Amino acid sequence: MSITETEQRCNELRNDLKLWEKNFAAQNDGRKAGRDDIKANEEISNKYKEYNKLRGKLTAQSAPQTPSKRTASRKATRDAERTPKAAPKYQTSTPLKRKRAEELASEPIPQSPEFLSPQGPSVIGPTPQRDGIVLGLFDMLPAGTPSKRRAVLGDVELNILQTPSRRSQEAASETSLESRARGERTPVSVGKRFMLNQFVTPKKRKMEEEGTPSSTTRGLATPAFLRRGNLLGPIDEADETTPRPAPWKRRGLGRSLSAMIQAMKKDEDDKLDEEADIMREMEMEEAGISMPPKKLRVPQILVEDSQAAMPLGPDRGLETEEDEDEEPELGPDGKPRRVWKKKGLKRQTRRVIMRPNFIKSKLESALQLHDDSEDDQDKVAETQATGHAADDVDSEDDISDYASDVSHTPKQRKVQKKKTEEVKDQPKEGGVKTAARKIKATAHANFRRLKIKSSTGAKGGAKGKFGRRR
């Protein structure tokens, strides 16, 4: 059989087998035919065998011949035509196996992630910076062109004595006319002027001359981490997406969508109820039926709140300024509440009540007929406490020097004035009057030295840290 006949027969067998497989799948609920199903049908199994044989022949005929199967005669003729080669050198080591181009082409390319996507360098050096500002590729280049070396006086022209060319009067500018009118000094020669300009400190730049600064001047600017305001780049609002809140963040007090929908539904229901009530009233009015009075809904409160209403919180601040002039608020017991006052520091010094010592008039002093001893005794009795009182005062001073005021204000002893009535009843002696006593400035009780007789004494006794030596 020729190649065309085998191909036609192969195509016929393949069409028959495809048709049988399709019918088998339709009869068996889409199940494909297996080996057992093919062996059970002898006709189909024979067609499979014949189809495999024909396919094998076609592939064998179309396969190319390998170069190793060439005839020896052709090889000999080719060797005769070529230039004879030198004798091969003997290799001491085992030669490596050479791979053919076909094998290299057929090798699979490893599909690792390194070859799928481009990657940068694995190690990056330090970023070049100057005063905190990252330098780019062109910032590190010198300001001038590096192709030509600059000399110090390379731009200076030769100072050759020559007749200066006459400048045209049309080229004279307004500035030159003004300077000429002001009487400027004699201009320097051109050679000297350009030569000295290389060593003169440059003048301050004017506002009109200032242009866009070059990248080399960025190094003198304020570093980025010390700037107070960083200029942000332009924001492209076209492709902005609505920011979605993170699920782990706590939501605010805003109403959710479901709550808003429920509120809208409730408003609609209330509106429909009102419309239905209005329609019902209109129908009843047309029919002549009187409307029953509406019942007011009273809240069913079993137990009222025992706490007082505090609209501004527990501190009970005044709601308005008018409330300040009102009466004080009453507590739950009916009594006015105590005004809260911030407590300060306690007393740091001892409290002393200084009572005034009234001086008797001259008329009263003229009636005093007591002896000097009795008068002194009365005055001492007024200013000096008894022995027990002195002991009590000393003991209290030893316990605490900063106790309450009650413990340090000794009760004055009530001394009855003797014989005051007898003096009034006695007749006045004629002609003789007692001279008025002059009271000293130190007669006040606070300036009188008291002779306190106690076991320890006013100074704490002889013992202790501050005791006197004997």
From Swiss-Prot:
Q: Which parts pass through the membrane?
A: none
Chief localization class?
cytoplasm
Name the Gene Ontology molecular function terms of this record.
DNA replication origin binding; single-stranded DNA binding
Residue ranges with Polar residues bias: 59-70, 162-176
Q: Does the keyword Cell cycle apply?
A: yes
Bias class Basic residues marks the residues at 337-353
- Pfam families per the UniProt record, alphabetical: Drc1-Sld2
Database matches in InterPro entries = DNA_rep_checkpnt_protein, Sld2
Q: Where is the composition biased (Acidic residues)?
A: 320-330
Q: Which UniProt keywords apply?
A: Cell cycle, Cytoplasm, DNA replication, Nucleus
User: Per the record, where are the segments of Basic and acidic residues compositional bias?
Assistant: 418-431
Q: Name one GO biological process term.
A: double-strand break repair via break-induced replication
List localization entries.
Answer: Cytoplasm; Nucleus
**Biological role:** Has a role in the initiation of DNA replication. Required at S-phase checkpoint.
Give the family, as the similarity comment puts it.
Belongs to the SLD2 family.
Q: What is this protein called?
A: DNA replication regulator SLD2
Q: Which organism is it from?
A: Phaeosphaeria nodorum (strain SN15 / ATCC MYA-4574 / FGSC 10173)
> Could you read off the lineage of the organism from its UniProt record?
Eukaryota, Fungi, Dikarya, Ascomycota, Pezizomycotina
